[in-house]
Swiss-Prot record:
Position of the signal peptide: 1-21
Pfam family, one: Acp26Ab
Location of this chain's protein in the cell: Secreted, Extracellular space
Keyword check for Secreted: yes
Protein name: Accessory gland-specific peptide 26Ab
Gene designation per UniProt: Acp26Ab
GO CC list: extracellular region
Purpose of the protein: This protein is transferred from male to female during mating and may affect egglaying and behavior after mating.
Length: 90
């Protein structure tokens, strides 16, 4: 009788543990880099970029988001846009 009760309790605990949902996963990462230089007596930004990544499973599916921004005082607008597109494709 005692073995039967222990077996029933163990079975209930196993069913309860395996029926729980998986834990929520959330990972975030960010980095920023900047370089400045004095040119013609003025401080100019050679490059300034930041990248943010996050991964979570809030909806039950693993979702990865990526945001990047880039700026420069010495590059043309076309070059800046090209670098921004490359950063957002990574």
């Amino acid at each position: 009788m005692n073995y039967f009760a222990v077996l029933c309790i163990f079975s209930c605990i196993c069913l309860w543990q395996f029926s729980d949902a998986a834990p929520f996963i959330s990972v975030q990462s960010s980095s920023q880099s900047r370089s400045q230089k004095v040119m013609n007596g003025m401080l100019r930004t050679l490059y300034d970029y930041s990248v943010q990544d996050s991964v979570n499973d809030a909806t039950g599916h693993l979702i990865h988001t990526h945001k990047a921004d880039f700026n420069s005082d010495v590059m043309s607008p076309e070059e800046i846009e090209r670098v921004r597109q490359q950063l957002n494709m990574a």
